[in-house]
Every structure is written in C-alpha cells, then in structure tokens.
Amino acid sequence: MSSFFYKEILRMTLRFFTVTDEYIAYLRKFESKVHYQYENNASTYVGVVLKKNDFNYFIPLSSYKKGNPEKDKAMKKRSRIVTRLFEIGNINNPLGYLLHHNMIPVPDSELIPLPLDLKKPKHKMMQKQLIYMKSISEKIENKSEVVYRKAAHEKDGYYLKFSCDFKLLEAKATLYSKKSTFQ
C-alpha cells in the first residue's frame, strides 16, 4: 500500500514513544538534523511513530512555549513541514508541534513506549496533544508522506534544507538493526 500508514490503525494506536540515547547518538554521527535528548534529561525526547518503507518513523514533538512568540511565528512559516497542535475546540490554546522534517527511522528495539501518568500536569497536556493528533490523523499522515516524498524523491530545495536525509537514515537504521542482531 502506498499510503504512509493505515489510517484506522493510526487512530486506534497513536501513542507516545521516546528513543534510546544510544540510537540517537548513532544517527547524529551521520545526520546533524536528527534531534537529540537534552542533557540531564531536562526534557524527554518524545514523539509518535508511523510506518513507512517497513520502518518505524519517529516524528518528534516540540513544545509550545508561551514566553517564546518567535518560535511560534517560525513554526507558522514552516507549516509545510510542521503540524501545529492545539487543544480540541480551542485554537487559542496551542500545545506544541509535530516536526515531520525531523522524523527518523527507528528499529523496534530502540523505541520506548511512554505511558502517560495523568497525575502529572505535563502528561495531562500530552493527553490533549494525543487527542488532537488522533482527530487530525489523516492530516498527519498526508503531511508525513509529502515531506518524505519531497525530500527523499523529488529533492525539493525547501524540504532538503530543513529535513533529515531519510534515505541515509534508513540505510543506517538497517545497519544498526543488523549490528544489534549479531551482538
């Protein structure tokens, strides 16, 4: 199927993950656009996972900061590669961003499910993000597909400027998986 992933499965299974620090460090050796975990776990590297070309593609989240209107302004300008997240029914309550241009292929062994503890305020906000993402899952699918195609196949300058080298990272993910299998 040419679709980025199965729509109904996404709506039912969309959830948060993080990625092992070792794997992120490995990918960053080859691609500087790969986001990374902040030192001392100041902020957890969180995202959602979609399937593409038999890979788990991790799409990282970036948080919205009320005191940083410049970041939101920049994200609005990058609407071709970023999905802005809001509370359902309240576009005046921005919750963060999905960074499609920074998505990375990740082996199953390097994905860590991130359960939500609704006693934590941050996790309550993340639940709102998840609810919103499920409501726009088709938009997420389409944007992920377009970003991948424009960067990996069409070599569109705008997408190449901001996006990870998906084909390179797929090759490195495959090598990493094989390396892990033989250890």
UniProtKB/Swiss-Prot annotation:
Q: Name one GO biological process term.
A: defense response to virus
The entry's keywords: Antiviral defense, Cytoplasm, Endonuclease, Hydrolase, Nuclease, Plasmid, Toxin-antitoxin system
Q: What outcome is documented for mutating R78E in this protein?
A: Loss of resistance of phage P0008, decreased RNase activity
Enzyme class, spelled out: hydrolase
Instruction: Offer an example of a GO molecular function term for this protein.
Output: RNA binding
Deletion phenotype? Loss of resistance to bacteriophage.
Query: In this entry, which stretches build a coiled coil?
Result: none
E.C. number(s) listed in UniProt: 3.1.-.-
Q: Where in the cell is it found?
A: Cytoplasm
Q: What is its main location?
A: cytoplasm
Put simply, this protein is called Endoribonuclease AbiQ
GO cellular component terms attached to this protein's record: cytoplasm
Please give the record's induction comment: Constitutively expressed in the presence or absence of phage P0008 (in L.lactis subsp. lactis strain IL1403) (at protein level); in the presence of phage the abiQ transcript level decreases while the antiQ transcript does not. Part of the antiQ-abiQ operon.
* Similarity comment: family membership: Belongs to the ToxN/AbiQ toxin family.
The record's listing under InterPro entries reads: ToxN/AbiQ_toxin, Type_III_TA_endoRNase
Kindly state the subunit structure of this protein.
Answer: Forms a triangular heterohexamer with a single 35-nt-long repeat of RNA antitoxin AntiQ.
Record annotation: effect of changing S63A: Loss of resistance of phage P0008, slightly decreased RNase activity
Keyword Disulfide bond, does the record have it? no
What the protein does comes down to: Toxic component of a type III toxin-antitoxin (TA) system. An endoribonuclease that is probably sequence-specific. It is neutralized by its cognate antitoxin RNA AntiQ, which has 2.8 35 nucleotide-long repeats. Cannot be cloned in L.lactis subsp. cremoris strain NZ9000 in the absence of the antitoxin gene; expression in strain NZ9000 even in the presence of antiQ inhibits growth in a bacteriostatic fashion. Confers resistance to 936 and c2 phages but not P335 phages in L.lactis, causes an abortive infection (Abi phenotype).
